Structure formats: structure tokens, C-alpha cells
């Protein structure tokens, strides 16, 4: 599972007369997220979700999608299957509204989440997704080099992805394992070259042989 992120503060929490909380959020398309600044010697890496990149599973109403705290399925807030998550796809963004019932508010991690969000500590929205198999979607992604006038980053644009969950986080974060799980190999023309299934193993063996 890959994690994306947009630290936008586009989250809104309101309490209804019933005692339930209504949580609304918005994840924008076509906005570059900086996954890595490249460190001292590397190149920055950015990721862009193209318009309606998450449309497939969102538009299939029988596909379950979860709203989680920190990408943990042990800390769910809402889901489609439970009837507590309404998520919609649009040209400019994915939007959702979740209902957090009074009973859920008594759960420790939910209470902690509500406290953190009310205090302004939880402002990030991060999708959990997978890239579909190449046999199903041949051109799901591409990697290009940034215009020299704008910088030297590698930019990965995702056109189709399978969305499984949205997570509320303190800020979107990208561990090194997450960054390396992505394909960052451009061709001379700037398009991605899919790596073979043994490419990671071959790179490791080559390092030991050197």
C-alpha cells in the first residue's frame, strides 16, 4: 500500500444536535506533494494525483473504503460498508463526509483523535492506495523531469489508482520505504519505465558484487 498526502487543513468538524460529529474533508487533485527534498546529494521527488485518479473504486459503490487514523485499520473512524462514510470523486478533488456516532466517541483512540483535531494538531489528509496492474491499466502513471527553470525534481504523476482508505494524520509523512516503493525511472523522453519484479533484488546483488 502506498500513502499520499496533502497538508491542506481542508478538514471541518461539526457536532450535530444528535451528538454525532460530522467530519468533512477534501483531497485536491493536480497538486504536487513533495515526498523527498533529495537530501544533500539526491534529487527532490514529487507526486501528483491527476484529475479523477481515484475514480475507479470511489464510483463502484459496492467497494468498501475506510476513513482511518494514521493509516491504521485498528483505528477506524468510518467506512462505506458501515454506512458512515460518503465519499465522492470530482474533477478537482475527492470530498467526503463521515459520521462519528456518540458511541464511537467513547472509544479511546477516537477521543484522542477528536482532541487532537480540535487543538489543531491533526490537519493532514493522506490516501492509502495501490497502482493497478499494468495489464489492467497500461498507463496508470508516468515519471518526468521537472522543467529546469522550476527545479530539478523527478515528478511522478498518477492517472489511475485504487483507493482503499483515507487517513487523518498530523502531517503527511513519507518514510524511506514508501519513497523507494515507487517507480522513479524516467526514459529519455521523460516517461516511466516499469521495473521488472526482480529489479530490486538485482540492484542489491550488484551492490554486494561491486
What are these regions (language model features)?
Residues 1-192, 209:
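Signature of dsDNA virion morphogenesis modules
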Amino acid at each position: 500500500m502506498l500513502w499520499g498526502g496533502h497538508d491542506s487543513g481542508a478538514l471541518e468538524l461539526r457536532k450535530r444536535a444528535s451528538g454525532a460529529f460530522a467530519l468533512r474533508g477534501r483531497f485536491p487533485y493536480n497538486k504536487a506533494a513533495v515526498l523527498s527534498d533529495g537530501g544533500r546529494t539526491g534529487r527532490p521527488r514529487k507526486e501528483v494525483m491527476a484529475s479523477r485518479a481515484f475514480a475507479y473504486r470511489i464510483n463502484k459503490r459496492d467497494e468498501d473504503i475506510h476513513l482511518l487514523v494514521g493509516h491504521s485499520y485498528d483505528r477506524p473512524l468510518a467506512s462505506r460498508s458501515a454506512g458512515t462514510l460518503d465519499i465522492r470523486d470530482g474533477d478537482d478533488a475527492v470530498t467526503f463526509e463521515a459520521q462519528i456516532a456518540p458511541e464511537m466517541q467513547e472509544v479511546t483512540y477516537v477521543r484522542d483523535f477528536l482532541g487532537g483535531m480540535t487543538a489543531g494538531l491533526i490537519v493532514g489528509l493522506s490516501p492509502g492506495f495501490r497502482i493497478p496492474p499494468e495489464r489492467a491499466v497500461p498507463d496508470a502513471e508516468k515519471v518526468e523531469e521537472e522543467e529546469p527553470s522550476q527545479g530539478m525534481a523527478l515528478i511522478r504523476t498518477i492517472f489511475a489508482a485504487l483507493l482503499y482508505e483515507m487517513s487523518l494524520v498530523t502531517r503527511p509523512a513519507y518514510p524511506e520505504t514508501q519513497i523507494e516503493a515507487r517507480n522513479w525511472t524516467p526514459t529519455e523522453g521523460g516517461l516511466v519505465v516499469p521495473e521488472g519484479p526482480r529489479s530490486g533484488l538485482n540492484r542489491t546483488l550488484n551492490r554486494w558484487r561491486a
